[in-house]
Amino acid sequence: MVAGVVPSAGELAVFCRPVVTAPAVVGRGGGVRAGGWLPDFVRLGELERHLGDGVIEEVVAAAVEQGRLRGRQRRRLMSYPLLVRLTIAMTLMPDASYCEALVRLVGLLADVPFAREWHVPTEKVITDWRRLVPAGLLESLFWRAAGPLVEDGPGAVRLAGMSVCAADGMLVNLADTPANRAAFGTAGTSDGSGPFPQLRLVGLAARAGRAMLGAILGGTRAGEQTLLKRLVARRPDLVAGRVVCFDRNFPGHDLIAAIVDAGGHVVARVKAGIALPMEPDGWLPDGSRMTWLNAPSGRAADRLPVRAAEHNVVLPHGDGVQVSDTCTLITTLLDHRVAPADAVRATYLTRWSTSETTFGEDKTTITGAGDRTSGPVLRSGSPRLVIAEAWAWLTATQLLRASAAAALNSQTAAARALRRTNNTPVVADEESFTAVWRHAIHAMTTSQVTASSSLDAHAAAAEAAARAALHTLNTPGRERHSPRVQKARPKFRHTIATKTTITGTPRVTVFAPGTS
């Protein structure tokens, strides 16, 4: 077959996929090689399309200019941009070693004859390069990727006209080294005898698209409430104009006051032992009541006014027995006409599918981690490398959700037909995080789409990502059928303590004024 000539029917044709676009270098013997150096062409595939081509190079260049990173002129087996991409990629490949992750990242580029030869370096070389890169560089990259991914549509969850986000925290098991134990500690033990040292992560996740708005890292000695206060103090813009939901481990006068001062509002559950005094004539028509949170100073002038709503939650058990519990929510939205008790309750219920699902996908889906004894999530053996790896992990999962959000925005009639329903658009809660993650790994090893790639290559990559994200769909609003495992450390190390299994949808009743 002659190049440029359309083959006739039945004639054998060779179909080729472009791997890289590079200037040709012709040797004396007539051999053709690709000009350039292989590490300069490595990309993160589908993930880098959403981060932006050249962003990693910009962050590296800024670190060199600021003196945080030493510039390197001579070509070596590694480069700073390649190392950053490898750190991000290896967080999505928990089963791969450094070298195996690099081989997957390089992908088809390894088959391209480059003018300058390159081979996979040893793990020691990769580790030495990791020690050169400050954790702040990966943190800067995370903040470039963080932020809302999906605009709130007409059917989005909003309260008092504001978008909703959720704050939550999780503990991440680390490699068991003396340095990690000394730096991070182990939660739930006073003597540090837990099976693994742990990193505490607190983040803000948007309800729309479950995007990570911001995050902060710390050891186990700092509680979730302390870390969230630090995050709000550093970045008050994250909560401004938003309703922040969190569970009963977070509420406190200073934290809630800080969120309100930043321009946000709070919907939170409080523990049963928290005293919420009744204001005179405090009952409101929607069943909520006016109360306040006492300040640490104890002065009445420093009290924080809030509105409380008690709800009776009936949990149907699998054997037909109903378990009843009382749940008290508080909110800083004091006008019951703007935020009635039913709307406050409905908003709080979205917390599970926002922060709980987001953190569960990040930790459990990718790494297979379950309870606190299931093994390390992050592999680094020194505290500085742990922090860098954690920021890379958060960046990677944010880019996965950016890919899922892009699939939602590009739905065609054919994509909607995949639902086998009434041809309606797919919503974010139906997308499979696992499917998006697996496709990202596949695209990382088979496609190196860069800014110089053709428009057809970009369109093909976007179409493949959307097809993978929309092909396998979850059922939104699924009921829980698994035992709830207690977070408290069991008395004996082989004991698994569980709570009641919930197999039905809770029925919620708002207390009427004057009821007990």
Question: Which residues does each predicted region cover?
Answer:
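Short Pro/Gly-enriched beta-strand edge/turn motifs at strand-loop
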Residues: A183-G188
